Amino acid sequence: MNEETKQFVGTWELQAWSVVNVGSGKKRHAYGGNAVGHIMYTADGWVSATLMETGRKAVSDDRNTIQALKRSILEHPAGPLDSDQMDLMRQFYLACTGYVAYCGPFDVADGEVHHRVREALMPQMIDTTLTRKYQFVEDRLTLTATTRDMQDQLIWRRHD
């Protein structure tokens, strides 16, 4: 592992996450500024990231109810759901859209870190590469990514 890559190894705690609309220049904070998270880089070249919106409401943990809803959706994709099922869907939608999680190998080259996603909460992230420009200042790591018309900047502090 080269010196550039070694700088990443360890656990980092999210300090700030801002999102800028590239076209308008309008800046906002992800999850209304209520984001927490950690990113871990291992010496054997893996990254694991979890970020979440604080204050998310708890959802049902009744496995039978959850499995019944899943079966209903899979067996009748266009079929109607009753009001209890719709409420449960709403709860899970809100919980999932307030959470980001992925892991996979990473590599560093030319001022960028590449997260090669193998597993993720959101299936569309699997088998993609998330490229971030990076900067180290003291105990801080800033990762910046531009996708379509948005630029995300995440500031992490090395966790002791």
Regions from the language model: what does each represent?
Residues 1-160:
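Lipid interaction determinants
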